[in-house]
Swiss-Prot record:
Keywords: Ribonucleoprotein, Ribosomal protein, RNA-binding, rRNA-binding. SUPFAM superfamilies: L9 N-domain-like (SSF55658), Ribosomal protein L9 C-domain (SSF55653). The keyword RNA-binding applies. It comes from Agathobacter rectalis (strain ATCC 33656 / DSM 3377 / JCM 17463 / KCTC 5835 / VPI 0990). Belongs to the bacterial ribosomal protein bL9 family. GO terms for biological process: translation. The gene is rplI. It comes from the Bacteria. Binds to the 23S rRNA. InterPro entries: Ribosomal_bL9 (IPR000244), Ribosomal_bL9/RNase_H1_N (IPR009027), Ribosomal_bL9_bac/chp (IPR020594), Ribosomal_bL9_C (IPR020069), Ribosomal_bL9_C_sf (IPR036791), Ribosomal_bL9_N (IPR020070), Ribosomal_bL9_N_sf (IPR036935). The keyword Endoplasmic reticulum does not apply. GO terms for molecular function: rRNA binding; structural constituent of ribosome. This is Large ribosomal subunit protein bL9. NCBIfam families: L9.
Length: 148
């Protein structure tokens, strides 16, 4: 019997796959536990429609990430860092401060977890901070750390 998996089933496959299993295994294990449904023409059509919808949503997310990347690339965020005599700084700038400054100055809601900053910024100057907006889209945000 052919079955469409509704969840990942360890020995059989992943969600959305069509697998061939014995009739007894399907009727006594897969279908009652709602791990899958029989691959009838109606269910196959529903699966096809779900896949088309998922592809469309993924494409829209990708396009919106590209549009946001263009905005992020052209944005300069200014963050103030306390400093003393001789240019010695106190404290550091983390992704949390950069995210808050981007929201305050430009209205950009950037997730601090998506900023790929290896270590905190501890000196004055200009920095490029990579922001992963989508698995395929990364943009560089310009951060200017000034004396404040």
């Amino acid at each position: 019997m052919k079955v469409i998996l509704l969840q990942d089933v360890k020995p059989l496959g992943k969600k959305g796959e069509i697998v061939n299993v014995s009739d007894g295994y399907a009727r006594n294990n897969i279908i009652p536990k709602k791990l899958g449904v029989e691959a009838t023409p109606k269910n196959l059509n529903d699966l096809k429609l779900q896949n088309q919808h998922a592809d469309k949503v993924a494409q829209e997310n990708y396009e919106s990430a590209l549009a946001l990347a263009k905005v992020v690339e052209n944005t300069k965020v200014v963050v103030k860092l306390r400093s003393g005599e001789g240019g010695r700084t106190f404290g550091s700038i983390s992704t949390k401060e950069i995210s808050a400054a981007a929201k305050e100055q430009h209205g950009l809601e950037l997730d601090k977890k998506k900023m790929q900053l290896n270590e905190s910024i501890k000196a004055l100057g200009n920095y490029e901070v990579p922001v992963k907006l989508h698995p395929k889209v990364t943009a560089n945000l310009t951060v200017s750390v000034v004396e404040g």
